[in-house]
Swiss-Prot record:
Protein name (record): Probable sugar efflux transporter
Chief location: membrane
GO terms for cellular component: plasma membrane
GO molecular function, a single term: carbohydrate transmembrane transporter activity
Tree of life domain: Bacteria
UniProt keyword annotations, A-Z: Cell inner membrane, Cell membrane, Membrane, Sugar transport, Transmembrane, Transmembrane helix, Transport
InterPro entries attached to this UniProt entry: MFS, MFS_dom, MFS_Efflux_Transporters, MFS_trans_sf, Sugar_effux_transptr_put
Listed Pfam families: MFS_1 (PF07690)
Family: Belongs to the major facilitator superfamily. SotB (TC 2.A.1.2) family.
Protein's membrane topology: Multi-pass membrane protein
Cellular location(s): Cell inner membrane
Length: 402
């Protein structure tokens, strides 16, 4: 039986909650521009497709810097590291709010991306580490709930605030909330010396694990497919579905709420049906993307599709995150830095592909292109599942990594 010091055990769920709140802030700021593309574009006399490239730049900076930043900070005590990360985060948001040009806005987003690169390299492993014994899957689920709430509350409220008071106010609001989160992290987290972070010597070892490499490839394909459509959901709903700004905000709320439902589904079924859950999630996502245009004419039908879509992408992300942690218990931070980097390659690639599709084929076709790409991911998933055989339950693998 694994035991912890009384004070650490008592505060373990509070620590996980604090990390989930931090995840809420980081995911809110990464994706809030999706709901503000038109407003930001008007400020700098740019089209939504042009402004959308800030999503690509942000994501690709994260992807390039996740591993180098993790290695550079691998010996720093984790609570102190999070304080530095949030300091950079807050300062960069203030710069975003006062940016006089799109170029300065991009510079500020790069600063946020550096903070993001470090945060997501260590957070999942920290949540698992401080969770009560036997509650690692639930800890990941709570972390995912913070991510989902960014979709439910952060992005829609950011859009509402941006439309009412300007998009700059949205970034100032995020900075203020982040400053409060810092105090909660200081109170909630125990001292967390760096542990099993790995080093450059870990890379050749990880690259020799074919199941892990397959997970990384699958991540890149499916995340690119998802963000090809999701990055341009605002102009899609307004120009193709002809929804009002208020209905678009509601649709974003629905998507985020579905993500919470997806995290619950993950917690319930990931141990018993790891392969089935992953294949079902990718298959459902593929179908939703392919049906986005055909079902875009009716608001209720589109809302239903959005719910299913949101559940599917959340189940997909959580399942792969859990597998990365279980397949690399000897180098969790390196493995998660690679996962975060590849995930963000997918985000940036999807935003870029969506921009190209919007400019040359029309924004109406982003779902079709994304769906075809997701179909390739489904084929890869089925092949690797057959090739590698049955996956052991997540709880069993996490217990072995202790």
């Amino acid at each position: 039986m694994i035991t912890s010091p009384p004070n650490e055990q008592a505060g373990s769920w509070l620590g996980v909650f604090a990390l989930a709140l931090a995840a809420f802030i980081f995911n809110t700021t990464e994706f809030v521009p999706i709901g503000l593309l038109s407003n930001i574009g008007q400020s700098f006399e740019m089209t939504p497709a042009q402004v959308g490239l800030m999503l690509t730049i942000y994501a690709w900076v994260v992807s390039l810097m996740s591993l180098p930043m993790m290695l550079a900070t691998r010996n720093i005590e984790r609570r102190k590291l999070l304080m530095f990360v949030f300091g950079l985060f807050v300062v960069s948001h203030v710069l975003s709010a006062i940016a006089p040009s799109f170029a300065i806005l991009l510079v500020s987003r790069v600063g946020i991306a550096f903070a993001h690169a470090v945060f997501w390299s260590v957070t999942a492993s920290l949540a698992v580490r401080i969770a009560p014994p036997g509650k690692q899957v639930q800890a990941l689920g709570l972390l995912a709930t913070g991510t989902s709430l960014a979709m439910v509350l952060g992005i829609p409220l950011g859009r509402v605030l941006g439309e009412a008071l300007g998009w700059r106010t949205t970034f100032l609001g995020i900075a203020a909330i982040a400053a409060l989160v810092v105090f909660l992290l200081v109170r909630a987290l125990p001292l967390l010396p760096s542990q099993n972070s790995g080093s450059l010597r870990s890379l050749p070892i990880l690259f020799k694990r074919p199941r892990l490499m397959a997970i990384y490839l699958l991540t890149a394909i499916v995340v690119t497919a998802h963000f090809t459509a999701y990055s341009y959901i605002e102009p899609f709903t307004q120009t193709v579905s002809l929804l009002s700004g208020e209905m678009t905000t509601i649709l974003l709320l629905v998507f985020g709420g579905a993500g919470i439902m997806g995290s619950i589904i993950f917690s319930l079924f990931s141990d018993r049906f790891p392969n089935g859950l992953l294949i079902t999630a990718i298959g459902t996502l593929t179908l939703c993307l392919l049906m986005l245009l055909p079902l875009s004419g009716d608001a209720v039908t589109l809302g239903t599709l959005t719910i299913i879509w949101g559940m599917a992408i959340m189940c997909f992300g959580l399942t792969l995150q859990a597998r990365v942690l279980s397949l690399a218990p000897d180098a969790t931070d390196v493995a998660m830095a690679l996962f975060s980097g590849i995930f963000n390659i997918g985000i940036g690639g999807g935003a870029l592909l969506g921009s190209v599709v919007s400019s040359h084929l029309g924004v109406a076709n982003v779902g079709i292109v994304g769906g075809l790409l997701a179909l390739g991911g489904l084929g890869l998933c089925c092949y690797t599942t057959h090739h590698f055989g049955k996956v052991r339950p997540a709880a069993e693998m996490q217990a072995e990594s202790k």
